[in-house]
Amino acid sequence: MLFRSDPASVVVPFASRRPAAAAPADPVSRRPVLIVLHRETSTPGRIGNALRALGYKLDIRRPRFGDALPETLEAHAGAVIFGGPMSANDPDDYVRREIDWIAVPLREQRPLLGICLGAQMLARQLGASVAPHAEGRVEVGYYPIRPTEAGRALCPGWPARVYHWHGEGFQLPDGADLLAAGDDFPVQAFQFGNAFGLQFHPDVTYAMMHRWTTRGCLRMDQPGAQPGHRHFTERAVHDAAERAWLEHFIDGWIARAPRTMMLQAAE
């Protein structure tokens, strides 16, 4: 089932960052954020850290291993769908169910964030295609992105280069705003109402990078991939900007709960 809507085309900038708090102050923020992971050992990384710093608890679920996704997000402040080694085009039942489920936060206008595979699943739910690069190139390492006018209006301070780990990309869904572009994979970030998709991985911690470059060392032999040592030398240069941008982005994204949701939570 594909979601259809006519979201407002005006990009509303994120508010200035709030200070980190031990506990959220408003009723909506007391609700946990749904975290969707795709491997037994996966973690929400820096995104989880940023949400916890704002006072949110995390409801972690792994549909691939039998965890059910909720029929509504009324009990959650928002949802994040992370990456994984599978494809959004895979025929597995859990992949199809997860893509179908994305209609729930879209319909309820809850904050939704897709990272890499999660962004591709969101794009598919919105009717866009997901496919490998025409020449077989991948992005594994740090690559430049270019924020669009809409992206700069939404959130300032975009990093010049960001971390990637993917071999597929997607078209910009109809009705979505392009927030950032790239070279080999043109769509790097987009917005559809309160839903956002990021093709790159600002969630990756230093420990995660060690695991990925060790267990996924064969990926670095693919066309376009960077050798393992460059992942760490470029991290030393670009990571601070990517982390600062992510913290601002997460704060602004999770604050986009619909007004009706806030009123219901306060009752």
Identify the residue ranges that each predicted region occupies.
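Conserved beta-strand segments of alpha/beta enzyme cores
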Residues: 57-59, 129, 161, 177
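Amide-donor transfer/coupling interface in amidating biosynthetic enzymes
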Residues: 29, 35, 146-267
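Short glycine-/acidic-enriched loop or helix-start segments at secondary-structure transitions
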Residues: 44-46, 70, 90-92, 123-125, ...
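Catalytic nucleophile loop
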Residues: 105-129
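Ligand/cofactor pocket segment of small-molecule handling proteins
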Residues: 120-158, 163
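Structured loop/turn residues at beta-strand edges in well-structured enzyme cores
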Residues: 74, 138, 174
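Short, hinge-like loop/turn segments at secondary-structure boundaries
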Residues: 52, 76-79, 129-133, 149, ...
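N-terminal beta1-alpha1 cap of cysteine-dependent amidohydrolase-like domains
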Residues: 3-93, 97-110, 221-267
